[in-house]
Amino acid sequence: MAITKEDILNAVAEMSVMDVCDLVKMMEDKFGVSAAAAVAVAAGPVAGPAEAAEEKTEFDVVLVDAGSNKIAAIKAVRGATGLGLKEAKDAVEGTPFTVKEAASKEEAEVLKKQLEEAGAKVELK
């Protein structure tokens, strides 16, 4: 029995946002495509002065301050980056630290929310 599109859709629906982001990256690498490019093509060209005010699509998630609960911030950084305990601790203590570079808007917002829930101050650049 072959896996159907519906089976794949159901499996993705049960995944966390971070797992879905990882899956998208893996698919981009495997097939040599970019999900951001497909969205831009599907949206079509924008006419007039709106072209000059093009919305930023990639963001750097920067940890500005760990806040009062450094342990929670370290756990959040480890979860977001996959760093080891010592590396995450050094990153949190050596702020500002770029947690993720060139993240999509959605992924950047998710990371920002996770870090802020841990008590950290975060900027999207």
Swiss-Prot record:
Keywords: Ribonucleoprotein, Ribosomal protein. One of its GO terms (cellular component) is cytosolic large ribosomal subunit. The keyword Protein biosynthesis does not apply. It comes from the Bacteria. One of its GO terms (molecular function) is mRNA binding. The keyword Ribosomal protein applies. GO terms for biological process: translation. InterPro entries: Ribosomal_bL12, Ribosomal_bL12_C, Ribosomal_bL12_C/ClpS-like, Ribosomal_bL12_oligo, Ribosomal_bL12_oligo_N_sf. Homodimer. Part of the ribosomal stalk of the 50S ribosomal subunit. Forms a multimeric L10(L12)X complex, where L10 forms an elongated spine to which 2 to 4 L12 dimers bind in a sequential fashion. Binds GTP-bound translation factors. Forms part of the ribosomal stalk which helps the ribosome interact with GTP-bound translation factors. Is thus essential for accurate translation. Belongs to the bacterial ribosomal protein bL12 family. This is Large ribosomal subunit protein bL12. It comes from Francisella tularensis subsp. tularensis (strain SCHU S4 / Schu 4).
